[in-house]
């Protein structure tokens, strides 16, 4: 555990580092797809983790998506995720986490979504994260363009550093 890590983050310290792997996506309005992903969790000594994510196409490495933000721990067992997307969307998700026996699980749901005038409509998001040892997996559900909340993305990542 880093010496300067804020004590409120001790339970989530195993997330720190760089994770990489592959995922897949689907939604009724698009063709299913696969992607390569890198996620970095870092810290600055305050009671939040810095989160940065980017994806590329499996076929040709073309950039697909990115998001950046903060994973806050307002109280033990509670998390708040604050993210910005270059597609013109911001999101605030709140939820819970548990950390026991080398397993971290988080469940979050949006409480607020902001959109620029040119962003595609997104009305709901929720995320589930599970870290076991050196594997991090997640599922993202989305409600968008008039459709209800449903599965959109899932990935399995391995710790790189």
Curated annotation (Swiss-Prot):
Metabolic or biological pathway: Nitrogen metabolism
CDD domains: lipocalin_heme-bd-THAP4-like
Binding site for heme b: 152
InterPro entries recorded: Calycin (IPR012674), Nb(III)_bact/plant (IPR022939), Nitrobindin (IPR045165), PeroxynitIsom (IPR054873), THAP4-like_heme-bd (IPR014878)
Record motif GXWXGXG, residues: 17-23
GO molecular function, one term: heme binding
Cofactor: heme b
Pfam families, alphabetized: THAP4_heme-bd (PF08768)
UniProt-listed SUPFAM superfamilies: Lipocalins (SSF50814)
Top-level enzyme category: isomerase
Cofactor note: Binds 1 heme b group per subunit, that coordinates a highly solvent-exposed Fe(III) atom.
UniProt keyword terms in alphabetical order: Heme, Iron, Isomerase, Metal-binding
UniProt catalytic activity: peroxynitrite = nitrate
EC number(s) from the headed UniProt entry: 5.99.-.-
Xref: PANTHER family: PEROXYNITRITE ISOMERASE THAP4, THAP4 PROTEIN
Subunit annotation: Homodimer.
Function, in words: Heme-binding protein able to scavenge peroxynitrite and to protect free L-tyrosine against peroxynitrite-mediated nitration, by acting as a peroxynitrite isomerase that converts peroxynitrite to nitrate. Therefore, this protein likely plays a role in peroxynitrite sensing and in the detoxification of reactive nitrogen and oxygen species (RNS and ROS, respectively). Is able to bind nitric oxide (NO) in vitro, but may act as a sensor of peroxynitrite levels in vivo.
UniProt family annotation: Belongs to the nitrobindin family.
Free-text domain note: Forms a 10-stranded antiparallel beta-barrel structure able to accommodate a hydrophobic ligand in its interior. In fact, this fold hosts the heme group, which is located in a wide surface cleft.
Record's protein name: Peroxynitrite isomerase 2
Lineage start: Bacteria, Bacillati, Actinomycetota, Actinomycetes, Mycobacteriales
């Amino acid at each position: 555990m880093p010496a300067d890590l804020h004590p409120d983050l001790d339970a989530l310290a195993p997330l720190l580092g760089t994770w990489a792997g592959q995922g897949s996506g689907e939604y009724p309005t698009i063709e299913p797809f696969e992607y390569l992903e890198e996620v970095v969790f870092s810290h600055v000594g305050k009671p939040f983790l810095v989160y940065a994510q980017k994806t590329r196409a499996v076929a040709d490495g073309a950039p697909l998506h990115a998001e950046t933000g903060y994973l806050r721990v307002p109280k033990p067992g509670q998390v708040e995720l604050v993210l910005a997307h270059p597609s013109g969307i911001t999101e605030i998700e709140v939820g819970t986490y548990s950390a026991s026996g080398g397993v971290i699980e988080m469940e979050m749901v949006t409480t607020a979504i902001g959109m620029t005038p040119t962003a595609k409509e997104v009305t709901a998001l929720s995320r589930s994260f599970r870290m076991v040892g050196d594997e991090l997996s997640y599922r993202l559900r989305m409600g968008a363009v008039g459709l209800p909340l449903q599965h959109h993305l899932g990935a399995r990542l391995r710790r790189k550093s």
